[in-house]
Amino acid sequence: MRTISIKSPSRLQAPNGAQLTTVAATVAMLLATSLSTPKAQAAESTESEELATVVVTGSRIVRRDFESSTPVVTVGKELLEQTPDFAIETKLRALPQFAASGASQFNANPATGGTGAATLNLRAIGDNRNLVLLDGRRLMPSTSNFAIDVNTIPASLIENVETLTGGASAVYGSDAISGVVNFKTRTNFSGIRFDVQHGSTFKNDMPNTDATLTLGANFAEDRGNAVFAVNWSDRGTIRQRDREFYRRAWATSYPASPVTIIQGAYNPTIGNNLPTEAAVDAYFATFGAPATAVSRTTSLGFNNDGTLFNATGAVGTNIYNFTSGVPLRQAVSTTATGGKVVSEYSFVGQELAVPVTRTSLFTKLNYKLNEYADVYLQAYNTHYDSLAESGPIQLGNFWAITVPRDAAHPVPAPLATILNTRANPNADWVLFKTTLYTGQRITEGRSDVSQIVGGVRGTLGLSDWTYDANVSSGRSQLVTTGVGGYVKNALAETLFDAPNYGANYRDSNGTCTSGVSPFGTFTPSQDCIDYMTVNPKNRTELKQHTAELNLQGGLFDLPAGDVRAAVGASWRKNTYLFRPDDALTIARSSNQDTDFSGTFVT
């Protein structure tokens, strides 16, 4: 079978100048017109080659005319190889049909995919609303929402990528609402090929190295072909502080909240036990604040000398008595007049790109049994290690610390004066604080994705009817381990609740020598940090089993061409299992999770 190309007048221009062919309704109309004149077509048959039959993504019908009711964009291997970025999802995002996805190389949040996975988001509907196929068959899902990690696809064997931009749920099922992306691999490869690439960004960081060895050979008098490929890839990282536009963004636009203040802050709005406005006015009047300039609902930050400052206002003009020496910046707020302030700290140390090391094995075998049957087998396994880093834990909102109001928990005199004006002066008060001293959250990810597909295809011997029957089995497992910065809130609460804020505290979980003072930029002793931090390990496992049978062929002829039909049946079973670490199943733990498992059959 030869590859043919029919170009429509409409083309998409790629960044490097390559033209991407689209097959649209206008082409279908022209071809339908030509089919209505069989005599003219016959007269020209001696001068033109016969068109090869192909299957266009979006229909299971084999045909010669490339008709499609919705646009199909085909990206060839030349464009994929010439695009300087190594990531497949980044190469395809050069097309307007693709939007940014939740899981990509530029996502360092382990809660949203920052573990090395890369998914596709067709038409910005969601990465689990488009179907990703390999040679027309389903791939093994890799994420909790059953999206496909395209890192598992052997890039060196990709011949082209077909993108159907219209909904295809009638043909492929409900997971093809936004369209279909079909990766087609090379056929009948014979020989040895070694590819190696190395590159970096324009700032000479985030180094990338990719090496692939491909072996292929024909056998049994060319009735069969076997291909084996091994790929190794290593990608470095970029931190957000390495880019000026990120540093500016953190300096002006991070959502304002007292939870980001590393000095700690008293939040009076939780618990419906506000101090009086008169007490707040009297305190801040000594620093030149007009009456009601600081509302009694304002969170009050703690200076290192025990005095208070307000966390609402414009930096340099309406922030009163800030003396801690920790840089403040203003964050734009649409809900507070004058804006809010937050502490400058190591958000910019967060990764912009996740470092990943990946190893992939892929094999493909085809063998022609007879004129009616070809058997095929395809299998792959991809393993990758990643290291995602995000900001320190914030003790606030749902994870806020409730501090007892008693003699065993002394507070600075200015705070005591304000707390004593509450309707219930002896009630607990609420602390918001970022635990900068516990460090950045660092998550190691280890993932394995494997799948095996086997089937038989051929002709039925009835006119031109063909069949394709296959089964597949796959498994995906992701293990993430927190190796730094994760706080078990229940243990942090234990220290803050203990007399003298946990100074010289000891129980079965460990010791705390210095205690964990809520006030100022106090850094506790290492044993206190060890007491409240954990190294959680979570396991996510997905399994998929499928069976599919498809038949297609011609029914009868009409003046405009033959009428063809396709009929098929499919069965699919998916199972999902999530087992979080015991430390994260306890109420109010940071990154809290619960066990979950389920199965669905379609």
Residue ranges and their predicted role:
Residues 1-96, 123, 212, 216-217, ...:
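N-terminal Sec signal peptide and the immediately downstream disordered periplasmic leader
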Residues 70-119, 137-150, 163-169:
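Periplasmic N-terminal accessory/gating domains of Gram-negative outer-membrane beta-barrel systems
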Residues 80, 92, 161-162, 181-183, ...:
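Non-catalytic regulatory/gating segments with a bias toward low-complexity or hydrophobic composition
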Residues 123, 164, 184, 195, ...:
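Transmembrane beta-barrel domains of outer membrane proteins
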